[in-house]
């Protein structure tokens, strides 16, 4: 890999496909460089982990309920013993509302994406067609060098056969 990477190939493929699956070296550091390149190209990035997402479609595009960690404490009311449900606005919608005026769009950078099911990855693949200002980068695994391909090409072989 070159010492100085411009990231133009990733940006070009992200604009072409709308969503890409990346394979990053396990020692890390590369995602920060590429996120910086995306911000320099005019995108706003939002990074979060795939662990604990639950329903990806509801989390990103719909109002969804969350419960804070109960830390061993129980509520004494008639509700659930693990605490109240707090409803949060859709992440994508609220982030798009607050984009700077000259921004090209929002890039969702999802780390630990290897734990996502193929149905969840399929939704993430279709998300840029539902909202054209949203691009998706999912870390699908590790590799010796930083590489990427279209997210639809990262489905498991058993899912592609269906």
Curated annotation (Swiss-Prot):
User: Would I find Transport among this entry's keywords?
Assistant: yes
Q: Where in the cell is it found?
A: Cellular thylakoid membrane
**EC number from the UniProt entry:** 7.1.1.-
Q: Which UniProt keywords apply?
A: Membrane, NAD, NADP, Plastoquinone, Quinone, Thylakoid, Translocase, Transport
Taken from the UniProt entry, a GO cellular component term is: plasma membrane-derived thylakoid membrane
> Keyword NADP on this protein?
yes
List the coiled-coil residues. none
Q: Name one GO molecular function term.
A: quinone binding
In terms of Pfam families, this protein maps to: NdhN
The record's catalysed reaction(s) read: a plastoquinone + NADH + (n+1) H(+)(in) = a plastoquinol + NAD(+) + n H(+)(out); a plastoquinone + NADPH + (n+1) H(+)(in) = a plastoquinol + NADP(+) + n H(+)(out)
The record describes its membrane topology as:
Peripheral membrane protein
Q: Which InterPro entries match?
A: NAD(P)H-quinone_OxRdtase_su_N (IPR020874)
What HAMAP family does the record point to?
NDH1_NDH1N (MF_01353)
Family, according to the entry, reads as follows: Belongs to the complex I NdhN subunit family.
Subunit structure, briefly?
A: NDH-1 can be composed of about 15 different subunits; different subcomplexes with different compositions have been identified which probably have different functions.
According to its UniProt entry, the function of this protein is described as: NDH-1 shuttles electrons from an unknown electron donor, via FMN and iron-sulfur (Fe-S) centers, to quinones in the respiratory and/or the photosynthetic chain. The immediate electron acceptor for the enzyme in this species is believed to be plastoquinone. Couples the redox reaction to proton translocation, and thus conserves the redox energy in a proton gradient. Cyanobacterial NDH-1 also plays a role in inorganic carbon-concentration.
Annotated protein name in UniProt? NAD(P)H-quinone oxidoreductase subunit N
Q: Which organism is it from?
A: Nostoc sp. (strain PCC 7120 / SAG 25.82 / UTEX 2576)
Q: Write the lineage as a comma-separated list.
A: Bacteria, Bacillati, Cyanobacteriota, Cyanophyceae, Nostocales
């Amino acid at each position: 890999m070159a010492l100085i990477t411009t990231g133009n190939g990733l940006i070009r493929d992200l604009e072409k496909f709308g969503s890409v699956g990346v394979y990053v070296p396990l020692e890390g550091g590369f995602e920060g460089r590429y996120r910086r390149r995306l911000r320099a190209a005019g995108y706003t990035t939002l990074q979060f982990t795939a662990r604990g997402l639950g329903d990806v479609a509801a989390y990103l595009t719909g109002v969804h309920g969350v419960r804070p960690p109960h830390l061993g404490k129980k509520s004494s009311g008639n509700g659930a013993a693990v605490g109240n449900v707090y409803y949060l606005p859709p992440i994508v919608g609220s982030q798009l509302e607050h984009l700077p005026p000259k921004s090209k769009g929002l890039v969702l950078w999802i780390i630990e994406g290897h734990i996502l099911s193929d149905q969840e990855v399929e939704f993430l693949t279709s998300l840029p067609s539902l909202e054209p200002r949203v691009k998706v980068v999912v870390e699908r695994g590790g590799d010796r060098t930083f590489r990427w391909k279209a997210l639809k090409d990262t489905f498991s072989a058993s899912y592609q056969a269906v």
